Swiss-Prot record:
Biological-process GO terms, alphabetical: methylglyoxal catabolic process to D-lactate via S-lactoyl-glutathione
Family: Belongs to the metallo-beta-lactamase superfamily. Glyoxalase II family.
Source organism phylogeny: Bacteria, Pseudomonadati, Pseudomonadota, Gammaproteobacteria, Pseudomonadales
Pathway note: Secondary metabolite metabolism; methylglyoxal degradation; (R)-lactate from methylglyoxal: step 2/2
Subunit architecture: Monomer.
UniProt-listed InterPro entries: Clx_II_MBL (IPR035680), Glyoxalase_II_hydrolase (IPR050110), HAGH_C (IPR032282), Hydroxyacylglutathione_Hdrlase (IPR017782), Metallo-B-lactamas (IPR001279), RibonucZ/Hydroxyglut_hydro (IPR036866)
Protein name: Hydroxyacylglutathione hydrolase
Amino acid sequence: MIQIDALPAFNDNYIWLLQDPISRRCAVVDPGDAAPVLAWLEAHGDWTLSDILITHHHFDHVGGVEQLKKATGARVAGPAAEKIPARDVDLGDNDLIEVLGLRFQIMAVPGHTLGHIAYYHAEQNLLLCGDTLFAGGCGRLFEGTPQQMHQSLSRLAALPGATRVYCTHEYTLSNLRFAHAVEPHNPDVSARLAEVSRWRDEGRISLPSSIELELATNPFLRTGEPGVIKAAKRNDERSSSEPSAVFASLRAWKDRF
């Protein structure tokens, strides 16, 4: 089984480092900065970077790709529908890619960007989802529509509850504060907010999450819940009870929260 660690980058990014201790090969996900990865490789001289996996084209996710490829010769895989530097493998919905001996399924999840993809491995209960699904929240809509993002999140929400969710930003605390504003009487949200507040005070990261936890605490996956619908309508009187409309209202509310 592979080991996964977070390499912090910039203010709140995580570059996920996937490691196979038997082969001493590793892969990274969304290296916006090459420096943390190169530092790790220098400290672990007998390891080889074999793959660089990209979820979308934003610079804080691809900024280190070319330097890493030049230094290591790693294979670069990313969404075919977006401009990804030094890409070797074009990926689209339902494609399969083998990384560190594991065959990942590609899921198209447009919304944050139009070509955004996620990497899913069922047997490992592993989801690498970039900026689509966050712990307690979801990505902003820079390119896609609310309907697209709601559909993408619904697709991720249908994965098994035990699926571990590896997103790429430490936004959990602010997301849960918003979730508490939406559902102030949800005990799961209150408990998670308190727990993550303690973790962050201790300097601990809040990831990975799980699909089960997100279904209980993430308002963007709870658009059919009566309390969430009521909160969305209270915030936007024009909002209907239709789930994608509830999502759109919540996303607009979060953007100014």
